Amino acid sequence: MYRKNANFVECEEEVLEYWRRNKSFERSCERSRGREKFTFYDGPPFATGLPHYGHLLSGTIKDTVTRFFYQQGYDVDRRFGWDCHGLPVEYEIDKKLGISSRAEVLEMGIGKYNAECRGIVMKYSSEWEAVVERLGRWVSFRDGYRTMDMTFMESVWNIFKELFSRGLIYRGFRVMPFSTACSTPLSNFESNQNYKDVSDPSVLIAFPLLKPLGGYMLSLVAWTTTPWTLPSNCGLAVNPGFLYGVFEHKEKFYLMHVDRIGEYFKDARILQRVSGRELEGLEYEQPFDYFEEYRKKGFFRVLASGFVTDTDGTGVVHCAPGFGECDYNAFVEKGLIRENDLVPCPVDENGRYTSEVRRYAGRYVKDCDKAILSDIRDKVLMNQRIVHKYPFCWRSDTPLLYKLVPNWFVKVKDHVDSLLRNNEKINWVPPDIKYKRFHNWLENARDWSISRNRFWGTPIPLWVTEDYSDMICIGSVGELEELSGRKIDDIHREFIDGIVIHRNGREYRRVEEVLDCWFESGSMPYAQDHWPFCKESGVDLGSLSVSGGEERNKKLVKENFPAHFIGEGLDQTRGWFYTLHVISSLLFGQPAFLNVVVNGIVLAEDGRKMSKRLRNYPDPSHIFNTYGADSLRMYLISSPVVEAENLKFSEGGVKEVLKTLIIPWYNSLGFYLENRDVEPDGRSLPMDGWITASFDNFAWSLTRKMRKYELSSVLTLALRFIDDLSNWYIRMYRKEIRAGHHAVLGEILKKFSIVMGPFTPFFSEYSYQSLNPGESVHFQEYPVCKNGTHPFEMAKSIIAAVRRLRETNSISLKTPLKSATLMSSSSLYEGIKDYIDAIKTECNVLELLYKEEDRSMFDITVKPNFLSLKKDKATMKKKMKVIQGLTGDQAYSLLSSPLVVDGLEILRDDVLIVKKIRCEGIAQEFGDFSIIIDNTLDEGMVKMKIAREFHSYIQKLRKSAGLRVGDDVVVDIQCPDLKGIVSKYFDISFGSLGALSGRGEYEFDGTLYPVSLYKKL
């Protein structure tokens, strides 16, 4: 595969063709059969839109983890899934057909409407497959699942029936977030996904009492931001523990919380105080009389309830139980209604008033705020605007209303303890999601609304009598066929809504609702395999038992459920992660997944949301076609976005990965391939052991991180190793490798290609096939490596220290140093003795001297380390006093062992020690060792510097001329003195024979000389 001057995008396309031609993914699946299972669940996206960076991110995470565990020796099923039902699809059809109400769908016919939905569900599936393939993700579309397939839907029915048979499904009325654009209620986690800042009315409304209170004919004052709910007012709520004050305003008397009066009426004087408890039961005049008949049921009275707060408003709450959950609960609490009773709720599914509210009938409620306030202007004490957070429909981006609706619920609230226990069994990355966000969501979980008043979805499999007094829950297609006497080929609404079941002389008809699509996606671990109807070996969930069952059942559960790994975005803590967790906990008493990687959001570089309209981000195809998928993958997984943080996407970041990882890797590969045919020399060189140890440490560290699902450090580890390989080993042994010492490099490159397979699948394959044509690199298991420290690492530290001293003292690396003195323990020096020549060469030092370190070489200062001392506050002050009195000798002894003074043990971490070397030269202490350099120059060293500078210039001229490493050149410069100096230190051919390849100018001794570079023919 390897070719010089390769285009990396073309390399990736070549690898794609290799995978297609050899059916590499399919063969990898065949090869792993019979291995221990690693189970992965793929969260289903909708195919009604094109994939974006969020999908590329989650796809990269999923592919990286599953590739890694495949190469760890596991059998990993990788199947793609499609979310086909629900609001996203219906909303697209509503826009396409101009549908704005439920009635229009019914007029059109559910069958025709659902046919339209079915027609667009897989609209972009081919584009999805192309992008997923180009990303390098190995996943099966052929064996994937679709939530609209009857096998999947039948399994969902079975899950529903299991819950129903356990008494976990019930029908009730609840005030819920309601999308008037989509004509359906939303769950609480859906309503939390799209809050916006909006401007709403902020009004004070007077509610006159029917009888005097304390000698005053007065009105209670309530604050509201929803004037449209005033026609449905049914009560006022106060807190029994609050004090309320009577005050006069414009010759009328009013009552509100004593501490809130000054907020709205600055000069008001409190005339009388009364407790909230004393107000309970008082009757008042409501703003509108549309529901006056409810007065005889106890409505239009003051209720005392603890939900009323004094942080804003007036301490008096206008209650419209048809539109406020707390209001509804207060009415239940006071016995005015029973749970699930109907109350006034005169708003239809499109957010328009019904005929019950005659004056505003047919109008959208929020459009009526001004008219309502105008009609009751004599009761309006304040009319202002307020900007506050308000929930919008996540799909239609329209304001939600809170509205009483009939609904089907899963009982979750009673099982919170089980949900929390199972959460403890899950490894979350990052971990704070587990202990904060997800834990808090579970702790406050409410019963789950699972029904939607829509059309394109899995129908709720309940057939009920007209009065709902009896129900039949269907758990399979066969069961419905048996009860109906009909052959069933599809279980969407249009095919089964007309089925009437007759039993014991009664008629049962199906309820109208469909299941929330989140219920479907939460059922995917079972429905993707058509559980419990499928008995296929390898994906056998047919014996998965809600009660545990025999040993064979337990074995199957262990092999196929729960998932070892899932990964999606942070928003899924209230979406897919939650629904998976609820269903598995309720049915099987265990979590649905054991490890989860939670990613954040990919934003534009300016920190704003990526927007096609603003064009504030590069198209993914541009990134693929400019830098390649590998660079994008590594950029994404090396960022905080894989730990639930947001990422400001930078094209420059992708380019940097290409520059710092892929290109040095390619150059190292090329250098080896150009020289591997040279007869091996059989020698062993000092740094062979080091580069082997460096690779082992890299592979060991990477494996350790990945087994903990910590992806973000992969790039750092890879860059550190590729630097060791290209900038140290190859650079230092370039001549030796050309001469035949290439076996170690070849073996390292081969193993590096294998280890990098999950992260850079394209270039890993390209590299591996160039080294070892044949089987895919992705079939190879990871090498077994150990972690350890090689002595050359200390030599590298010494080299870095000398270079740092040069830099801080403005001494060029081309300037030779007369000597560098290493002061350290004898054991440290013994460890680096084999690398003294390498240290001298890398530091451009003529002589490396050694002195064993002792106390007399340093002036010691010491001070307390507060960060360490504060861990034990009982001894902190005493230790600080002791440390401040330590002598230099005592402080020095702390470097090797603890010190006991006045009965207190002082540890090394308790102090900050500064060692200043006693010498007049350039010196610095570096922890385990100290360095002194002698930069005095003699004539020979000056000439050496001149030679190195000219040699460096020639290397740069070669590069700019496009010459390769192995090209022999002749240099022409008409300066005999310079040529004489350079020839003493470097093997450079001078002359003017060959093909002219480059020109330049070089300054020597104040004169500028022309330089020509000729390539030998």
UniProtKB/Swiss-Prot annotation:
A motif ('KMSKS' region) lies at residues 609-613. A motif ('HIGH' region) lies at residues 45-55. Keywords: Aminoacyl-tRNA synthetase, ATP-binding, Cytoplasm, Ligase, Nucleotide-binding, Protein biosynthesis. GO terms for molecular function: aminoacyl-tRNA deacylase activity; ATP binding; isoleucine-tRNA ligase activity; tRNA binding. It catalyses: tRNA(Ile) + L-isoleucine + ATP = L-isoleucyl-tRNA(Ile) + AMP + diphosphate. Its main location: cytoplasm. CDD domains: Anticodon_Ia_Ile_ABEc, IleRS_core. ATP binds at K612. GO terms for biological process: isoleucyl-tRNA aminoacylation. Its EC number is 6.1.1.5. It holds the Pfam family tRNA-synt_1. GO terms for cellular component: cytoplasm. Belongs to the class-I aminoacyl-tRNA synthetase family. NCBIfam families: ileS. This is Probable isoleucine--tRNA ligase, cytoplasmic.
